[in-house]
Amino acid sequence: EGRIFLSGNQAVALGKILGGCRVQTYYPITPAADESEYIEAHEIIKTTTDGGQGAVIVLQTEDEIAAVNMASGATLTGARAATSTSGPGFSLMVEGLSWAGNNEVPVVITYYQRGAPSTGLPTRHGQDDLRFAVHAGHGEFARIVLASGDLEECYYDAATAFNYAERFQVPVIHLV
């Protein structure tokens, strides 16, 4: 009664839509790609903006570096924008994250954690990446790291990430 069944990726995708995400970039990587593919496959989910209809633009990029930089660029135009990745992809995004942090760009990065080092175990999840998210980047800059504990938190944190990013003008990393 009053409940729906969702995967974690679907909960994050719907949370991003609730949070006003208008641009979602990604490079296919397990397990993060399912989120963007869910948004893309469900274009029936329309969002109202200023009395008109709108939707989320989903862009599959050539690599993770382009994904984070495209999301930052979209944010600079005034759109609420995000990207999603997992461990190895986040490693490639660090320079773009540093640039966003230095320039106070309110971009959201959804970081799907994997267990184990390197490419990890794509089908097993853990919190091995928390420290990396907190300290990633060249030099010091402000950032917010949200670490969701369950599907409900994934949903609400995905929406809240955009509010924090916009209010404090910093990158937000959402760990799931």
Per-region residue spans from a language model:
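Thiamine diphosphate
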Residues: 1-136, 141-143, 147-148
